[in-house]
């Protein structure tokens, strides 16, 4: 997958100056190194991912703001169900290497849990609503503990520290607010309810995943007491 395909849209390019876009492109190598570390620590291949130029945010009634720096998104592809990680350009632009690694490692846990639940059809029984033949998957719901997945203890410590109570990085948050949101760079407002993806049950039932990935997930389940 072309990580930067969203920036090929002329309408997107008009939203940023050339210098800013160039700075994003230059940090792609940092993103790739962070992905490699997650892969090495887990012994698994990271799913496809791309950089999203429009920042998803949520404003609550009390004036607080939540930023979706990355999201795990299942979607219906021509070949069946597929899963992609959406990485925000804001995170790539303003995030430190340790924060980018932590966010990617966190999303990878969401990815593994989603594959686990779909492969066992748990997501069907959990989330089909009423008589509507579709299921809802929330990116914020369930997650596998990092120590069951990652052999890299430093990465596990960083992940637990950064996500002790939601994601915590004041410097990244301040830069995102001051240099992205307050300066009018593109955002899309998503409530927690809207940050959900509808997946047809027929697609879930026909889903196929890499046998090696499923075997590793079963090993993780045993460690976590989920088997």
Predicted ranges, named:
Residues 4, 153-227:
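Pan-zinc metallopeptidase signature
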Residues 58-98, 111-115:
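Active-site scaffold of zinc-dependent metalloenzymes
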Residues 99-107:
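Short alpha-helical catalytic segment bearing the HExxH-like zincin motif
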